[in-house]
Structure formats: C-alpha cells, structure tokens
Swiss-Prot record:
CDD domains in the cross-refs: crotonase-like
Residues that coordinate or bind NAD(+): M325, D344, V401, V402, E403, K408, S430, N454
The EC number(s) this enzyme carries: 4.2.1.17, 5.1.2.3, 5.3.3.8, 1.1.1.35
Protein name from the UniProt record: Fatty acid oxidation complex subunit alpha
Reactions this protein catalyses: a (3S)-3-hydroxyacyl-CoA + NAD(+) = a 3-oxoacyl-CoA + NADH + H(+); a (3S)-3-hydroxyacyl-CoA = a (2E)-enoyl-CoA + H2O; a 4-saturated-(3S)-3-hydroxyacyl-CoA = a (3E)-enoyl-CoA + H2O; (3S)-3-hydroxybutanoyl-CoA = (3R)-3-hydroxybutanoyl-CoA
Source organism of this protein record: Pseudomonas syringae pv. syringae (strain B728a)
Amino acid sequence: MIYEGKAITVKALESGIVELNFDLKGESVNKFNRLTLNEFRQAVDAVKADASVKGVIVTSGKDSFIVGADITEFVDNFKLPEAELVAGNLEANRIFSDFEDLNVPTVVAINGIALGGGLEMCLAADYRVMASSARIGLPEVKLGLYPGFGGTVRLPRIIGADNAIEWIASGKENAAEDALKVGAVDAVVAPEKLQAAALDLIQRAISGEFDYKAKRQPKLDKLKLNAIEQMMAFETAKGFVAGQAGPNYPAPVEAIKTIQKAANFGRDKALEIEAAGFVKMAKTPAAQSLIGLFLNDQELKKKARGYDKIAKDVKQAAVLGAGIMGGGIAYQSAVKGTPILMKDIREEAIQLGLNEASKLLGGRLEKGRLTAAKMAEALNAIRPTLSYGDFGNVDLVVEAVVENPKVKQAVLAEVEANVGENTILASNTSTISISLLAQALKRPENFVGMHFFNPVHMMPLVEVIRGEKSSEEAVATTVAYAKKMGKNPIVVNDCPGFLVNRVLFPYFGGFARLVSAGVDFVRIDKVMEKFGWPMGPAYLMDVVGIDTGHHGRDVMAEGFPDRMKDDRRSAIDALYDAKRLGQKNGKGFYAYETDKKGKPKKVNDPAVLDVLKPIVYEQREVSDEDIVNWMMIPLCLETVRCLEDGIVETAAEADMGLIYGIGFPPFRGGALRYIDSIGVAEFVALADQYAELGALYQPTAKLREMAANGQSFFGQASSEE
C-alpha cells in the first residue's frame, strides 16, 4: 500500500500502475470535505515520491464517483474574511494542480455521478473514461455559486467556451453520451468494462501510443480564442443567461465573466481569478440563502426517512372525489407505481378525472418522459368506480371532495364503514380542522390530513396534518406514501390553515390593506415580482380563485379573530360580490384571454377599477419598500407564530413549506431565513414602524426576546455581514 487514509487509498496494481481509490469511510457517498482534501494532498505527494509509479488510475469505492464538496462545511467557511477564503481556495486548488502536474499519465474511471468538485477533480486528470450509466455536471449555480476547484478554468479549455458556458450556467447533469459528444470525456463504456478500459488507456499512455503531455498542455495555456471569437462567445452568452437567470441569481453571469477574464491567462493566474470571483459569490445573500435552502431540504428528507421505520407499505390507494383534483392525485399515484381506485358518485366526474390523468400522461409522453407502454401501465393502474365494492383491500384513502366540513364528515364516515380496520383515511383539505373532521369517525387514530397543492402534478409539497387523535403510524404511512408519489412531505400539527395557508392569508391581508389604501394592484404585483415572487398577489389570487380566497379568508378570520378578522369590506369581497372569480371565469383582478397554446393570458381590465372603488378608503403615499414591508411582515410574523405554537417543528420545515408550497423566493431562503438576513432585532424594529396597521404587524414576545439576546433562527450570522 503506497498510501492509506480514511477517505483515500493508493495501491500498486501492475507494471508501475497504481490505483488511487476514493472511499470515504462511514459515508454512503464520496465528497470533498476537509479530510478528503487533506488526504488527496497526501496521496498525490505519496505518488510523486514513488519513483516506481508509471501511471495513475483514479476510482471510487462507492456507487457514485464523487458528489462534490461537503456543503455542510460551507456555512462556517463562508463566514471567514474574504482574503482568508481566497487563500484557502487557492490552497485547495494547488492540490488539484499538483495532481494535474504529476510526471506520469492519469486516468479517471467515472463509475457514477461526478458533480461539482467531483467533476473538477476529473478535469485535472489527463484522460476520463465514463460508464454509460454515469452522469456528470457542475451544479454550483443552484447554490448561488460557480465552480471553485478549477471548473471555470479547465472545462472551457477542454470542451470549448460555448459548451462550458452552457454546462456551468445551467448547472445541469449530463449523460455519458452527451459528455462524449462535446469531448468532456475520452471514452464511454459499459459499467462492467470500466476498469479494463481505464487500464487499457493508461497502458497506451505509458507506452507512448498516446501523448499525455500534449493532451494536458491546453489546460495549462490560455483559452484558444481570438478577440472577435471571445466577444461573440462571452457577450452573447452574458445577455442570454442574464435574461434566463434574472437579477436575483447573479452566479451564472458572474461565471461567464470569470471565464472571460481568465481567457487570456495560463492556468495558475486563471485559478486566481476564479478564486476571487468564487469568494465574491460565496459572500452574496443569494448564495447564503440557497445553501441554507439545500441544507434545509436535506434535513427535511432526513426527517421524512425517520418515519419509514413505522410506516406501513401502501400497495393499493384510493381517492374519493374525481374531477380535476382527484384525477391529479390518481395520476400522481399511478405514474409513481401505486395503483389507485378513483371513486365518485357521478359518472361525469369520473370521466373528468380520467381525462385529467390521461392529459397529464399524454403530456409526459409527448415530452419523451414516458414510453407508450409506461403510459398504458399507469392508465391501467387507475380504476374508476361508482361503488365501494373494491375498497376492502385499500391501504390508504385520500378524500378529495368539496371543501365543506359537513360534506367531508359524511363522506369520511361512509368510507370508514367500507374499508378495513387498519385502512388510513386522509383528507385533502386546505383549511378545515382535522380534529373537527375526526369527530365523525369511529377510528380517529387512523385519520390524518393530506393537503395537496394545485396543480398536484407540479407542486412538490404535501402537508401531512396530525390531528389530536392521529396515530404516529397513520402519520408515518401518509408521509411514506407522499414520498412514494414523488412529493416532499412536511408534518404539521392541526390548526386553521395548517402551515402554508395560515401564513399565506396574512400576506393577502397586507395586500388587501394596500388596495384599500389606494395603491394600484398592478403596481403591487410588479413590486412583489421584482422582490422575487413568481407572481404578484393579485395574479396569485386570480389563479387560486377569488371564491376560494374568500372562503379561506373567512375560515382564517374565524380561527384567528384577534388579527385576521377585518370588519371592513376588502378587494376580495368586492370581486366576489361582482362574480369576478379569477381565471376560472375569465375575470378577477385581471381579465383573461386564451393564448396560442390554449392557456389563460392575463390582460388589464379597466372595468375592475369601478368594482374596487368602494373599498378604497384612503389615498396613501406608499413607496415600493413600503409595499414589500406591508406584504412581507405579516407573512414572516405568522411563520414565527407557527413555529412558536408548534404547528411546525423546525425553522427548516417552516421555510421549505413556503418555498415548496407558495413559491417563496428561493434566493431569499424562506421567511425565517429572510428575518435572519435582515437581523432579528432589525426586523422587530422594522415591524414596529408599521404597528399602526394592526395586530398582524405585532412581533411576538418571544421574537422580541430573541432580538434582545442577539439570537437567530438558523444560528448563523446575518447574510448582510
């Protein structure tokens, strides 16, 4: 053994060939944490010091190759001063360069996923052989960063600037054939032939058949583009990528600028330019929020896995209530492999549900995401029925009938009498108390809430609601079924609106106050879209449905009268009374036309101004900053209350619920991370400036205590520091 560590070993194979193997002990994947980087340095030094070594093959002992850097280390690392961060980055890069500069040929055998730093390590080798099943990519832009281990330097010099810009700016994973096509790898072979192919390649390089030094040289030189080619490659790309990414995600454009800046320099100077830019990105609020979001997502998945131990397997599901929602739930279950009965009392509703499932499956077929055979299999897994005849062997029933407590209670009591004693019943409700609905049941321990978001096939979140009498097994089984459906489940405790709607309605409350203060709703939409929301509140209300919003607001006002009840008529009341229900009937805040693709397209409708005139009680001068604060303070404070009330267990779950459920701007990290980014004390002071607007703007006593003690929700420095 030439070298042996906890993450890397180097052993002799044959005829001077050595194998440098990544296999991080105690982990399911390889990643570049401090330990692995340190051992990589020692392993490279050991190879350098051994005169008998004629070539190096790099392999992985895991199913994947190397998944990238250890993101859990970023939080503390990125708090360091810029100069220290740059120095640390260059120190790490020296290890990759030392590996690249070995006086023998190097071949990497990519057996599985190689992402981020994992791919950057591969780029430092002379040759890359890839299993046909493997995937490679540089996804750093998804964290608000760009490659920092030489990716912006080596990749353009290997596959050309245009291809490298596309790979780096998109952050996408690339299949083996695509990687071969652009020259990112030198060969693609069947997985079982990977080791033999790597050995063959290294032997041919050792024998001189392949000139590894000539292969290496372009990576050490300037980028081979003249001034006109550079201008065409970089300026065009910057404009296009800026349009795609938008102003809140600076990393893709900064990556292109870095490649451009470094184009006229050799490797070492180019790496210095990359390091400076990488650190600049690491210090942005967007990067800190997106890294936090990634870590929150990991925590969420870990929590969901924790339920697996007591979850029962759902082999057969059922949905009560067909139509669009029932069809969407049936589609999602069937396409992910769980057969489902779809029951309704009306044949036309069944047909509507089947049409919805068929339309969604057809869409996947058209896009090449599904074969015709798989589509047929999924359609056959949805069995429509008008009776309870086959419900005896159903493991879980999702009730998705109209949002009316009496109707739901009647339907749930009826289905309970037609299923097995251990069958779990789950109500797809957005606002009705699960404990209230459970009063109609003989086995309330088998009952939970399972709140899907519309449209079901697109929205990643499912709220699993624990009622007063819900058993842990019922909760766990519903979480497991939601995961099986490809959703991100969050367990919340019962209260009006649960987590997402309880937080959303104070946001709409801020909007209603603005409109009543004479602020143009079109302007409000533009300001909130600029802030980062996918759509403004008026447009969102039209999409949700004015009638749905009106009903939800009344439920929330009844549940939290101290702060959500408003005796004055609002914009929602005015539109509801005028039967302007939003997209569903072609007019709400906006009017709707059908575009060329048959989708609704919003247009301004002057007639709405007359409808809104009676609910405008004053004309206030309000700045864009005020608009953001009127909207965001109530949302953030209600999220704080949900955490304090134990509706949601952790800050991570609260934030991810808002990102997955209502499109909270990801680059801001969620409501609680947004408070952290401002500073808890600063946020409390900001809220106090708007105290005259009512109870929704009042910080809780506990939040004031956090402010006084200098605490934060995620226990890290503000991203503004």
